[in-house]
Amino acid sequence: MFDHNKLNFTVSKHLMFNVDGTPVDPAIGMLLKRTDTQQPLSVVSEGYEPVQYGDIVNQVEVGLQESGIDMTDATFDTKVFHNGEQLELRAKFPAHQQAMGRFTDKVVPQFVFRTSHNKTWGNNGMVGLWRSMCWNTLVSGHKLAYTYGRHTKGFSVPVFAAKVKNAAEFISGEGMTQMNEWYNTMVDRDTIY
């Protein structure tokens, strides 16, 4: 699935030190560093709890596997930027592609997610069928599940993984048939209450 070799590191908080060697009060900030290279990634608050990239990916993968989504010819793209400061994940599931409504082009279900350890990207992810999307969670299509928020405030990896699983179950089950029926149901002013 996703490339775990690119995620083979963890991060942890460390005290910062002034030029004269005295420690900086942790209430002012702490240094977030990779544990393998000791490379600094960001200054974070004392109460900040780092979320490891590997934990996110592992739980999302379990959710996808348990959903029953057809992984035939699925593509998984794992991008890590700036030595681990940022992560972007993308997956496409062509076995479930659909032609929606009057359109004849095929729309492929997708999963996208990005986050960062350097505060540039919040936790931002979506599952659905769309022709185009932006990271403000706007899509030209259908977003079946999403998360959007600050890095760790209110972000729960298990809750997000469950949303991904539910959306994938919808895609792999009767959901797509229902969605096509909705698209093909003609309505007019007289039939709308």
Which residues fall in each region the model found?
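Intrinsic disorder/low-complexity polar-acidic segments
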Residues: 65-193
